[in-house]
């Protein structure tokens, strides 16, 4: 049982032996800076994750970061605070955990290119002319991963992959020109890193978040993880494709915002959060969602 549990609002009817309950903003901040914690896993969805990351870093805690929006909207703030407090940022996104592993857990190691992989999401095989008719239920059926509604929709439009490009720019000091995105339907290669001599290292594994989460807590050690091994003979082949810009206009928009910098990524994130909620409520169709 946890020592501390935080609720959105106070509830006198909830009690557990040995567990202290806090609530609201004060409880949220207390949990992020909990004195007994060595590492804070920030897995809050959306813009709210920025506050969690900043609270934890301000307390000198290492942050296992599963919330990419923290870097999309406040990358400079997050990284400068981490450096000031001597805290470490440990990537939890499967793609960025893969890059981190390929760089031997050194986010400042030199490289030539980062190759991020994308499954293509739930809409990858829907004819483009039929995309406006896609329902939220269809868009939530990710072919490889089980995730929350917001990120699953962002994967369907590949806005999520655009955010991951921005995340790579912050985490690894990469230029936009050093990041390549490839559609990889099998989701076995989680990302790759190319070095100056042309060598490419890839991190592979079955599509599961268990390993990235575990590794953020155990590195530099690798502990046993109850995941099935990759059956390469059964797979037979791995496939990679260029991103179809016509199918995924949100991805192109994200790259444009990454290039412009400033407040553009923050505005894009806000627009994305509002648009996805409207889509999930049935207020807009896929075409309007992709136009943000």
Q: For the regions a protein language model found, what residue spans apply to each?
A:
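Catalytic, metal-anchored helix/loop core of enzyme active sites in primary metabolism
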Residues: 1-292
């Amino acid at each position: 049982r946890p020592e501390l549990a935080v609720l959105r609002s106070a509830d006198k009817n909830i009690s557990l032996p040995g567990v202290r309950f806090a609530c609201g903003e004060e409880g949220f901040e207390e949990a992020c800076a909990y004195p007994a914690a060595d590492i804070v896993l920030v897995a809050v969805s959306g813009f709210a994750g920025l506050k969690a990351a900043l609270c934890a870093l301000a307390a000198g805690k290492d942050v296992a970061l599963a919330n990419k929006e923290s870097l999309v909207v406040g990358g400079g703030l997050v990284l400068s605070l981490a450096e000031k407090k001597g805290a470490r940022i440990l990537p939890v996104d499967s793609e960025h955990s893969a890059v981190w592993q390929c760089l031997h857990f050194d986010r400042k190691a030199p490289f030539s290119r980062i190759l991020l992989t994308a499954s293509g999401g739930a809409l990858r095989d829907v004819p483009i002319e039929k995309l406006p008719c896609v329902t939220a239920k269809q868009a939530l059926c990710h072919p490889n991963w089980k995730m929350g509604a917001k990120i699953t929709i962002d994967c369907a439009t590949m806005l999520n992959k655009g955010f991951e490009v921005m995340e790579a720019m912050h985490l690894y000091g990469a230029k936009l020109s050093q990041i390549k995105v490839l559609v990889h339907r099998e989701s076995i290669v989680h990302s790759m890193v190319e070095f100056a001599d042309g060598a490419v290292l890839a991190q592979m594994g079955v599509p599961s978040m268990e390993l990235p989460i575990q590794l953020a807590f155990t590195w530099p050690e690798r502990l046993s993880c109850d995941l099935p091994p990759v059956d390469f003979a059964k797979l037979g082949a791995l496939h990679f494709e260029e991103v179809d810009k016509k199918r995924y206009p949100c991805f192109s928009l994200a790259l444009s915002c990454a290039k412009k910098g400033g407040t553009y990524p923050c505005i894009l994130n806000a627009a994305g959060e509002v648009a996805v909620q409207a889509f999930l409520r049935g207020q807009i169709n896929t075409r309007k969602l992709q136009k943000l």
